[in-house]
């Protein structure tokens, strides 16, 4: 995923010079094309993730489109206060990219594990959370969120993930994407473990005919809005509150 992210970001910087990439002492070779062709669009902020996050907020206030990038555990939990106060409360258009999410960097020890990032960040107002399933969806969703004027947490795997989408990906920000259509069982997943759901589908498809849904955008989930309002209306009628 990280290579796909770097390629897609390079393409987008060619179109929009307001995009600024801030890296936390990682991805030096990964972003060689950006550094060589657009040296003013890349800054290595070093092992100072909290400062990098505040710098991104300042750039956003100055009409730039900042993207912060480093290992997920460092770009989320170590920077939680800056994400909340500097980016999300003012609702600034910063994209926070975490790479090697989950156990992507498991061999480097518990400091590099990120199993609780979604649970924690989902409680911060204004923060949108997107978790692509493979390299193609990473490119598609990155291009979409770069056009939006909102804070976004883009949760990536590391590398070598199996493809979910081989040639075409029609994922749209905020909307569930149906991958397989069935009629008895519904399998829901997201991120780089979605491939496991497809493997499970292949094992039971001749018996149960399951559907598979990719919830790549965890927040917001537009398809749930009308059902939330309907439920709220019923509760109000029942004087539940």
Predicted regions and their residues:
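Thiamine diphosphate
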Residues: 1-155, 160, ...
